[in-house]
């Protein structure tokens, strides 16, 4: 975590080969410094006097990315920043609708370039149409079938990991939620045998976290040298090892499934069904699913529980949530209609995602040909652009925007605002992106999160110690929950039989 938050604290020192690469890199940087800029947009955190290169500018962004972005928006609606991953063009939220549908804005190319998909160890992040089709055609349509298995798995995990003691006991919130999310996801993705295997869970969880560290390490190198540098960086070597170990575990299961008839509802079958003869790598696809499913889902659950516990009238809010859960689940059971009718829980989640989104800017796109925005701003071909998600803190859109109001979106929903649903992205709230490239798995993610929180809040009393103070941790473009909070739980005595 410390390396992720402070990626410039460690200097590359990983073998003689690195010295050769650094020599080439210095020459490359000199060439880049002498080359003319592609675009005349202002840079809001560029090099200061007597600084050579972008090291200090990148470091400043790592320490206060949100502040730099907000300061830039006060000066211009389109500008450059020097981020940990290099220069970026940042656009104000008024450009969101334009960017989401512009033919020159390519999301797949952006992802491939942004996350080094051509580099060994990062193949997991190559855009795969087969995976998108499996999510859209199979996963989303099968949510109703998966709800009871997800509920059963959640109950089993909580029984084992959180226990039945009616005395308050402390949990490491970050690790326990990550464990819960990764296992429930894995059982749905690869089945019970592999999904409950601790070694598999360790691989998929560690690949996701190690990828962020390796990404920042690799970004210290010029783009042209990254396919070589990856073989000299131990952080990148970890990714390749995770892929090899995942293949060793998954290949025998795939061979067995292909040779014997079965009737299962998970991605091992869905990938094969939707592929239609197209080539794909099931190991990379599974790691890609895990990377998408674990971190952001865990983040939202952790922050939501934190917000609930820190709310000024937490006792009443928890009671309101439990009453809604009991009423809805007794009426509907684990059906899709229940997820729709959990209106307060939906509002709580959307409000948490509003006050503390995962990122300050998103909607990354690669510009395939020169484009002119509605205000006349010209973006050259070959640039990467991002749109800020800062309307979530705009008082013109959300009254008292810095206040966490769990009932905010219930009121909006009751007044007829269809965009008040958690899974409905808009330029005012881009927690799941926007347009055709918005998160395709958001319906599954929202369902999974609600199931997990129903189990947690109906079965356990939760609190944060009185002396604890919650602080959102900012690192570059990312906003992380406070992982240092003391989170305590105890088993509730209500004997609710609503899990059928």
Curated annotation (Swiss-Prot):
UniProt gene name: ausR
Membrane topology: Single-pass membrane protein
Protein purpose: Cytochrome P450 monooxygenase; part of the gene cluster that mediates the biosynthesis of calidodehydroaustin, a fungal meroterpenoid. The first step of the pathway is the synthesis of 3,5-dimethylorsellinic acid by the polyketide synthase ausA. 3,5-dimethylorsellinic acid is then prenylated by the polyprenyl transferase ausN. Further epoxidation by the FAD-dependent monooxygenase ausM and cyclization by the probable terpene cyclase ausL lead to the formation of protoaustinoid A.
Tree of life domain: Eukaryota
Disruption phenotype: Eesults in loss of 7-hydroxydehydroaustin and accumulates a new product, 1,2-dihydro-dehydroaustin.
Family annotation (CDD domains): CYP503A1-like
Needed co-factor(s): heme
Entry EC number(s): 1.-.-.-
Native organism taxonomy: Eukaryota, Fungi, Dikarya, Ascomycota, Pezizomycotina
Keywords: Heme, Iron, Membrane, Metal-binding, Monooxygenase, Oxidoreductase, Transmembrane, Transmembrane helix
Protein name: Cytochrome P450 monooxygenase ausR
Xref: Gene3D superfamilies: Cytochrome P450
GO CC term (a single one): membrane
Major site of localization recorded for this protein: membrane
UniProt pathway: Secondary metabolite biosynthesis; terpenoid biosynthesis
UniProt-annotated location(s): Membrane
Annotated source species: Aspergillus calidoustus
Protein family: Belongs to the cytochrome P450 family.
Gene Ontology annotations of biological process type: secondary metabolic process; terpenoid biosynthetic process
Residue ranges crossing the lipid bilayer per the database entry: 15-35
Pfam families membership: p450
